[in-house]
Amino acid sequence: MDPSQHNPPVGHQIVHVRGDSETDLEALFNAVMNPKGAVVPQSVPMRMRKLPDSFFKPPEPKSHSRQASTDAGSGGVLTPHHVRAHSSPASLQLGAVSGGSLSGMASAGASPQHLRQSSYEIPDDVPLPPGWEMAKTSSGQRYFLNHIDQTTTWQDPRKALLQLNQATPPSTVPVQQQNLLSPASGPLPEGWEQAITPEGEIYYINHKNKTTSWLDPRLETRYALNQQRITQSAPVKQGGPLPPNPHGGVMGGNNQMRLQQMEKERIRLKQQELLRQSQRPQIDLQPSTANQDAEHCDELALRNQLPTSMDQDGSSNPVSSPMAQDARTMTANSNDPFLNSVSSGTYHSRDESTDSGLSMSSYSVPRTPDDFLNSVDEMDTGDPLAPSMATQPSRFPDYLDTIPGTDVDLGTLEGESMAVEGEELMPSLQEALSSDILNDMESVLAATKIDKESFLTWL
């Protein structure tokens, strides 16, 4: 036969049609539907084949790793286990269960167990849990009564206990089962005795208190020791209890130092806040009459001392030496309680400053003293003056000349300008300023930037 006939030309395909295709397909169906009737060709027996002798003999266990290896293709060393071998009642280890203890099922062997192992039925001689009773229907089917919950069920409660013991650690088992599965080792404490109920449950008798308990006293002692060890290892700090430190004493010391630093910082901030609050003007603490009397006394003392300081200095500069003397005199004055707190040395002159555009040569923007503003408010509102202040209008121009930054007369504007060299800011205003005066001061300060050639105009 020409081999060129088997190779079709390019682009052509050859289709072969067999005449016996239907019969061959029917034979396949018959072989599947009737396997016994199908003709199976006999194969050569294993003994008749040319196989080595080692194929029929299991390997002997030897110390060499390759000769004793289990991946050589033979499993003679391992006993085969069917995956559903544990589903038959015959393979159930009844010896460990019938003794009253369910702990034997937890160690039923190292062989793998199928998930459907609960398909077997536990024999009737295995005791039920406390409070359960088994009964049978008229057809012979078993059911279980729970006298505790007063319910009935088809499920065997013993199966649930067996699965629970095998699947979960003993810590989640009830207390009675925990005592059975993992009893504490060691002798019982003094005055305790272990006993067993007729059902096989273990309980403990305390002869000192004449009480019984399901709990093992050895477990309670261990729990108390663990709690004491935890409380001793936990660092003691201020501000409440903290969890024990798992990193040791080094981290505990670092945390303690950090907490101490935070506590010191908080105390320092609190002291600064209290000091700042004590430096604010206390307007509502005293009656208005007492404030007026104190202001009048301060004003008289200032008037008596300002001309004397100017004469002693012998200089006509109203900025440097008279104002320094004025500040020292006002600080030494004991009539104002706020000035006494300033003289303690804890007052900072720039705490309440609202501007930052000035040079560092001046502490803050100088302003008109409190006593003058109070007396101007009284004159503007038409309030009568005290009898001791009858000579006040005649002394105002001399008094105002000694104040830096202002050259104000009542109704007159002087032509000469004075240099603004700020000294100590006046501590506080004893009376609240009117909104008009504050608006005028803000407009002048914003427009002139406190230039040396500027002066304030009072309208």
UniProtKB/Swiss-Prot annotation:
This is Transcriptional coactivator YAP1. The modification Phosphoserine is found at S21, S69, S87, S119. Residues 247-459 are annotated as: Transactivation domain. One of its GO terms (biological process) is hippo signaling. Phosphorylated by lats1 and lats2; leading to cytoplasmic translocation and inactivation. Changing S69A: In YAP-4SA; prevents phosphorylation by LATS1 and LATS2, promoting retention in the nucleus. Disruption phenotype: Embryos are sensitive to deformation by gravity and display a markedly flattened body. Mutants show delayed blastopore closure and progressive body collapse from mid-neurulation, surviving until just before hatching (6 days post-fertilization, dpf). During body collapse, tissues and organs including neural tube and somites become gradually flattened and improperly aligned. Keywords: Activator, Cell junction, Cell membrane, Cytoplasm, Membrane, Nucleus, Phosphoprotein, Repeat, Repressor, Tight junction, Transcription, Transcription regulation. Residues 307-347, 355-364 have a biased composition (Polar residues). Transcriptional regulator which can act both as a coactivator and a corepressor and is the critical downstream regulatory target in the Hippo signaling pathway that plays a pivotal role in organ size control and tumor suppression by restricting proliferation and promoting apoptosis. Plays a key role in tissue tension and 3D tissue shape by regulating cortical actomyosin network formation. Its main location: cytoplasm. Residues 51-88, 103-129, 231-254, 307-364 are annotated as: Disordered. SUPFAM superfamilies: WW domain. It comes from the Eukaryota. One of its GO terms (cellular component) is cell-cell junction. The keyword Phosphoprotein applies. Pfam families: TEADIR3, WW. Ubiquitously expressed throughout development. CDD domains: WW.
